[in-house]
Design a protein with these regions (language model features):
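N-terminal targeting leaders characterized by basic, low-complexity, disordered sequences
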Residues: 1-51
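Hydrophobic membrane-insertion alpha-helices, especially the h-region
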Residues: 60-81
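Substrate-binding cleft of extracellular glycoside hydrolase catalytic domains
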Residues: 106-232, 238-240
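Aromatic-lined carbohydrate-recognition surfaces of secreted/lumenal glycan-active proteins
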Residues: 237-254
Length: 313
């Protein structure tokens, strides 16, 4: 058999080299095929309709919902603060026969009220109702300056019955000397007991005044404690379904941390023209020497800027 020189059997070394080359070729081919498969699967994973991207959608939706809820909460708080931060144009105040009114577009929008206690003695409420009085704030009780006992105002029931019979809407106020939240809640419970069964048509007010002449038990409380007491009182009253107010003059109210006390303010200042405070207020007690038919003594007069706080009987 004739063998061509070029077709001679390969040597052992040539066989080993060819085997190694074939092995490398096999690995290259395998890598190419595996790479193509990987590329195909990789492209599939990055497709817009990929399963793992679909799983991210609920997370993104949840984040959007949380952002929307946070925005709603912030807007609600802002609106609440705006409702308390009332602004008035004092040029709209009108003065007539010792009384002050507030008008908008030529129409009187305010209400005129009195606040009374045992200091006014016996009151002819029918005569009061005929003298342009729209509502009354009646003192229902007090806490003692020193020992801290609770007392009902001795004319409270008579005044409440008289106002109700005469058709005058009324609220009540309590003179507080609470030194902690527990006592403030006790005062609120006492008020609720006193007004049980009555038609309370106006807010219930928390009245804490500085009494330096009497060395009163609540004189030296911190702003933090006074604010906590007021909130405890107001929260209990609101739980019972009533609206609330905080009463005081500039000095009294400066004792509170008003940034953390989001209640309506009943402000006292007797300058006879307009309030000079920057404190947001809804009612202004503008004199302690008012004259009203049916009351033999001087009486406090008030202008209520938000008539919605008085509910007809």
């Amino acid at each position: 058999m004739i063998m061509h020189r070029n077709n001679k059997f390969p040597s052992k070394n040539n066989l080993e080299r060819r085997s190694a080359h074939a092995s490398r070729g096999s690995r290259v081919t395998s890598s190419f095929i595996h790479g193509a498969e990987s590329s195909k699967h990789s492209n599939f994973r990055h497709s817009p309709s990929l399963p793992y991207q679909t799983n991210q959608f609920p997370t993104k939706l949840l984040l959007i919902i949380l952002v929307i809820i946070a925005c709603i909460i912030m807007i609600t708080v802002a609106l609440q603060n705006c409702s308390l931060a009332r602004e008035y144009n004092w040029e709209n105040l009108q003065y007539e026969n010792g009384r002050i009114f507030y008008s908008e577009n030529g129409t009187i929008t305010s209400l005129t009220g009195i606040d009374v206690s045992s200091h006014q003695g016996t009151i002819d409420w029918n005569a009061v109702s005929q003298d342009g009085i729209d509502f009354a704030m009646i003192r229902c009780g007090t806490r003692g300056y020193t020992e801290g006992s609770l007392f009902a105002d001795e004319t409270f029931y008579t005044n409440a019955d008289g106002a109700q019979t005469a058709g005058i809407p009324f609220g009540v106020y309590f003179f507080s000397q609470a030194i902690n939240e527990q006592e403030a809640i006790e005062e609120a419970e006492y008020v609720l007991e006193l007004i049980q069964g009555m038609e309370i048509s106006c807010p219930i007010a928390f009245d804490l005044e500085d009494m330096p002449s009497y060395n009163a038990r609540a004189n030296d409380l911190s702003a933090e404690q006074i604010t906590a007491n007021a909130e405890a009182f107001c929260n209990r009253i609101k739980q019972a379904g009533y609206e609330v107010m905080i009463y005081g003059n500039q000095h009294d109210l400066s004792r509170y941390d008003l940034e953390h006390l989001n209640e309506e303010i009943w402000y006292a200042e007797y300058n006879g023209t307009q309030p000079t405070t920057s404190i947001p207020l809804v009612m202004w007690q503008y004199t302690s020497t008012g004259s009203v038919s049916g009351i033999s003594t001087n009486v406090d007069l008030n202008i209520l800027f938000d008539a919605n706080l008085v509910h007809a009987n």
